Amino acid sequence: MLSGAKQVMGFFNTIFACIINNAFYIIILLLPFILFIIFNKKINFEKLKLKTILYYIGSIIISFTFALFIINSDKNSKDIYSKYNLYNNVYYPTYSAKTFGIVKTFSLDIYRYFINFEDKIIINDVFNEINNDSNYNVTNINFDDLINNEKDYDIIKMHEYFKNKEPSLKNKYTGIFKDKNLIFITGESVNINAIKKDITPTLYMLTHNGFVFNNFYTPIYYASTSDGEYTNLTGLLPTEGTWSMIKSSNNNMKYSLPAMFKTNDYKTYAYHNNTYNFYNRDITYPNLGFEKYTACGNGLEKKINCNIWPESDLEMFNETYNDYKNDDKFLAYYMTVSTHLNYKTTNNDIVKKNINLVKDLDYSSNVLGFISTHIELDKALENLIKNLKKDNLLDDTVIVLLADHFPYGLSKNELEELNKDIKYDNNLIHKNFLVIYNSTLKEPIIVDNYSSNIDVLPTLYNLFGFNYDSRLLIGNDILSNDDGMVIFNDRSFITKDTKYNALNDKTNDKKNLVYDKYLYSRLILEKDYYKYIK
């Protein structure tokens, strides 16, 4: 009970700090209401004359007719985000607000809510069908039989799409980690610019050895950490307007990280050093395929101090290692919390613990606090590697580490303070690191392909030599010959050749591909599509 109260207070302090920091904008938002209260007695409402009423009605009819004419003027446009498609077929509030305005987008959302609107499946370019060639990461799925025996229109169209979607080729890295263990870590807000060789040496070693990804991003999506985890663990893009991870809790998730490892005879564990049922993890984790889930409130509080905020990653790693070390093959997943905002000593126990270790660095107090939280994770990883080495498990264990999202607890100026060589824009702010490390890789393998967290699962499945169908995941194997793409929550994207801003740039050949990735990610979630795959 005390543990839960402490955690709630930690989040309350964070929320309160955000309110204080944005007080000016909140006042501006409330200003019309405040002025109305002050001056309402001085406002006179006169009864309208019939002529004036008719004038207003006529103006509304003319405006409405003109709007319909404009919307239908590009009905035959091939642009997936044409005004006609945005109004009738496509759910894309960010771009709708830019096209129609906020008020119209809001009213359209209300209307669609009551009619249970769903995106229409708009067929884009179709790939050539790929046979079950052994050079591809595909499985023997008979899509023709599935199509012939299905009556649901959307499911049929999904079968057709995935049947003809181009799979990834196997490559020289296929199966190099076969039968090795995996420790997969989603690090709360961890960031490459907080990693210093002399301050966080283990993190520095991990990010500069194994596979080194120079153009990896961790975009933030609609539900922050929950969506970051969803993407990391499923290889799917989150769906706007819903809690994707929670919604998936009743679905067949047989292609998720734990489900795939479980299918390949691994014991699967999940750990989180915060409240066990936050974001409904006590429901979503088992459904994903984790056989044992331990967090504060369902057992971890007996092993670590769950009465501080945020809790210690070091304690969690130290006290859970023995759970899985003796298994033949294991997947251990950690969702950390020590690097959680905010980063002031007044209400962050990890900052209080480690701040003296960074006090001589030339940064502002908030940035120093952020760096100090990474020390806790660094020590956790240092001890983990020592334990693996002591038990002769290091060579047989792969360590994966990536963030859930960028550290939005820091301002843009504070982020630029961390890396003075970069002026951040809305996309570059998400550039980060991906660790895929195994001690048998003696030299760093440099990867320049553009990628993000939706690409991690297909990359790992190929490295571990799993029999999987790459067409059914939205991301791509980063180590394949496919051109990589980083997709952001407003449907902007970056490739090696292109930097596309969805709200400002008019056309790009790849924006239909981005539309497809969002559409089919949503349909997989909403239709529980994987249950149809035999």
What residue ranges belong to the model's regions?
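Transmembrane and membrane-interface helices of multi-pass
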Residues: 1-136, 529
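Solvent-exposed soluble domains appended to multi-pass membrane proteins
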Residues: 153-534
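Short coil/turn linker and secondary-structure boundary residues
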Residues: 3-6, 141, 150-153, 451, ...
